């Protein structure tokens, strides 16, 4: 995605005070500034994760920096496991809401801001959700609304955990996104969340893939294959006049 920016300038996280270094493969650790059409944009090539030992305050620091730079919209994406039995590998799930099972007491909520400590609001912007779904229809590819569940990671879930998450109402599961999305909404940004379904959970014993492990290489391969879909949705957001 960062390759679509014109006049791009990349700044390594190691050059930015307070930024950590991503450890997950495929996460370069760069903040890239440039133009997306006629709109100034900042992209993160890599994110920090809780399972890497980073505190939520460190994970959301790039979001606070973007807000201070004048950002108005955050589009956040992730690779996720499909819990909903109707999902297929390669589908896009436009996040309607999330369940944060990895939240830790005293972390990122409203720290250092004047907003209420426990704000009650929609994290994901309904208008952006509608635009994203319209973009998928126009591009003739599959995208649905759903609930994202965040876990600590880095291990993938057991079959019993998959069943529990589905009963909680989650459609997809991953190891990121919730801290960034929540603090962005707390700072007044409009948030659009996109999950790429990179594997589908089939926890029932005897199902075709119940005993097949998910590998990080498989996740990366599927993620690379849906870049055009994500770009189409970003283009739709830009054309909509919301930006």
Which residues does each predicted region cover?
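Metabolite-binding pocket within alpha/beta catalytic cores that recognizes anionic/polar moieties
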Residues: 1-119
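Non-catalytic positions within long, well-ordered alpha-helices that form the structural scaffold/packing
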Residues: 66-70, 166, 185
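Zn-dependent metallopeptidase/amidohydrolase metal-coordination segment
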Residues: 175-218
């Amino acid at each position: 995605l960062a390759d679509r920016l014109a006049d791009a300038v990349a700044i390594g996280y190691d050059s930015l005070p307070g930024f950590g270094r991503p450890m997950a493969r495929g996460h370069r650790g760069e903040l890239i500034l440039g133009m997306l059409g006629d709109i100034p944009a900042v992209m993160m090539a890599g994110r920090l994760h809780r399972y890497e030992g980073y505190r939520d305050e460190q994970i959301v620091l790039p979001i606070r920096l973007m807000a201070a730079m004048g950002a108005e919209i955050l589009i956040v994406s992730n690779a996720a496991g499909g819990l909903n039995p109707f999902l297929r590998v390669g589908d896009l799930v436009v996040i309607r809401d999330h369940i944060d099972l990895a939240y830790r007491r005293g972390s990122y909520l409203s720290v250092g801001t004047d907003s209420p400590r426990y704000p009650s609001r929609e994290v994901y912007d309904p208008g952006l959700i509608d635009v994203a779904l319209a973009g998928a229809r126009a591009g003739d590819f599959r995208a649905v609304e759903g609930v994202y569940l965040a876990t600590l990671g880095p291990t993938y879930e057991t079959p019993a955990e998959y069943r529990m998450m589905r009963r909680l109402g989650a459609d997809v599961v991953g190891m990121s996104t919730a801290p960034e999305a929540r603090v962005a909404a707390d700072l007044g940004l409009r948030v659009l969340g996109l999950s790429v379904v990179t594997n589908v959970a089939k926890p029932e014993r005897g199902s075709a893939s119940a005993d097949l492990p998910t590998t990080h290489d498989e996740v990366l391969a599927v993620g690379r294959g849906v870049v055009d879909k994500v770009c189409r949705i970003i283009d739709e957001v830009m054309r909509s006049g919301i930006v």
